[in-house]
Amino acid sequence: MSDPKTIAQLRATIADLMRWFEGEDLRAAVIGGVAAGLHGRPRLTKDVDAVVFSDDAAALVASAGSYGFATRIDDALDFSRRTRVLLLRHHSGVDVDISLGALSFEAEIVDRAQVIDIGGLAIRIATPEDLIIMKALARRPEDIADIGGIIDVQHQLDVDRIRFWVREFSSVLEMPEIFEDLERLLQRRKL
């Protein structure tokens, strides 16, 4: 997504997402590639990811249409009950994945979110620390690259918070390699 048309579509999607969050008083924040690009190395992405602290996917779907969003699969509500992800599409054609937050950590993500102004567009995004935590759990190559980009750009990270949450999730999931991978990355950057 590097041509002006697709950048404009992404911007329009984010603008409507912010209007939706504010208009419906949703506890929400942008996460994923958009947020990682704003906190770290800029990169383009094909979709927008957000976390909304809500259990009511039906109410979200009902209000989404007023802001230019529709479900992108036929059984979106059933899918969201099984996966806690609501799959939407903006009228511009950009896909939006809404994670339905329920964990205390997800509540913290939205409560700690920051507003960043990009060319007059105020975007509510997860903090750099919370993005690193989420991306450490995902463990995909692009997530590891995003972590590196965030660490390289952000020089006032709360590394204790990052270590605490990744250690907690690593323990609960019985996957010590999650914490070990993060620790190697932090040590390489002398954090």
What name fits each language-model region?
Residues 1-191:
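Compositionally biased terminal segments of proteins
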